[in-house]
Amino acid sequence: MTVLVRYLSPEWIDAVQAELTATGALVEVAGAHDVGITQVVTDTPHGTIVYHLQVGGGQASFASGPAEPEHVRFSQDWSTATAVATGNLSAQDAFINGRILLVGDQQKLMDSQPVFGALDQVFNSVRARTDYSDDA
């Protein structure tokens, strides 16, 4: 039986970091890219959650709190975050409709697209072990 981790919980953040480490997916692109991305998710069952992805110098990490240094910050509410994470809403549609707000270096974000491709591999693996319910 697979043990589920609640989306955006400390255990989920740890599971993403563990998968990132196990697959090495981001390490391959971390030598060519240097970016700190902070995610802020509001209105979750446990308040506002802040976590980040830090990539650069051949290393990648995923942890609670803001990126240091932070190049890009995404902000969204719980319903948007869960809809995007479960594939019920594309991130592109969420941006276009103003449901995800972006602050920071947009050019660095565009230059870092290979990072997001590698991160998708990590999220796809963790998604199968994630509980997206909003039960507190």
Report residues per predicted region.
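Feature captures hydrophobic
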Residues: M1-A136
